Amino acid sequence: NETEVDSDVTIPTPISGQLMNLSQVNDQTFSSGSVGQGFAIKPSDGKILAPFDATVRQVFTTRHAVGLVGDNGVVLLIHIGLGTVKLKGTGFVSYVEQGQRVKKGQELIEFWDPTIKKAGLDDTVIVVITNSDKFSDFDMMMKAGQNVQAEDNVLELKAKNEEESAIGGGQVEPAN
């Protein structure tokens, strides 16, 4: 069943830290946009909050990532760090399970940053819209390099109209 997409959606950051463009992420899979459009955060704490009211679609057994389906129609993947699947859940606590309803601002996952760093891994938190093809425009509302607090709005999405839906996904426009 297809999620109904709201016409315009703003995506807040689920974590505090320094805003990065997805293209700056040190992983082709994410930086190329093939998983979806979005943004990344160099975290300043270890709390991942729900960016909007949603249903938890998936919690990875290793707790380093969570998938949400928002009431706004956005399907979101929040991925903590690069290569962190190797940690097998060490340093990560999940507060939610698959199918659970969550409210905006509710804590989803907590992670201990030193565990990631000690393992020599990148702690960048990646936020991607996996149903990016439903949207025509992705506009960053803040510049990369800015410090953001959890729940600050950072990305604006515009839903496609019917004709555009046939064409494919748009690209992220940088903030000017």
PLM regions and their residue ranges:
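Contiguous, well-folded functional domains in the mature portion of proteins
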Residues: 1-176
